[in-house]
Amino acid sequence: AQIKEATQLSASSYGLQPYKIIEIKDAQLKEQLKPLTWGQSQVTDASEFWAFCNKDVVTDEDVDTFTALRAKTTGTEVSALGGYSDFVKGKMKEKSESEMFNWTAKQTYIALGNALATAAELGVDATPMEGFEADQYNEALGLKEQGYITCVLLALGKRHEEDSYQH
């Protein structure tokens, strides 16, 4: 719970957090994903397995949703945040497709970094994983329809005492 909370509290540019984290709990889905992760055992063996997914594009609607949440959280009128909202929308529209992907991926990695730091602080082993077939992950997790792309994976748990990689 603490690791998840750390990712939810992660800083991000403009405060948008253009990503989501999917906790993959279903054993059958993990078995389906394992070959797409080049057979890495952490997919099925780790206590927890997460997919960090970044938005493929940040829309005006995304900014409006964020602005409404910010207004509610701070007790501010949405109209008072209109200037900021317009500024962010303008910045998002300036980005090319590749710039948008790179920017949202960087924001996602900030959250991953917080998850890794929190896991280390709690004594939980964490394995970030970039070795996977992203397009096939996107399909298996139904991400394209949601406007997300699998960015990086994270396996969490405690190592077996006899793990030969433990030092």
Regions found by a protein language model. Give the residues of each.
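Acidic, surface-exposed loops and disordered segments
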Residues: A1-H167
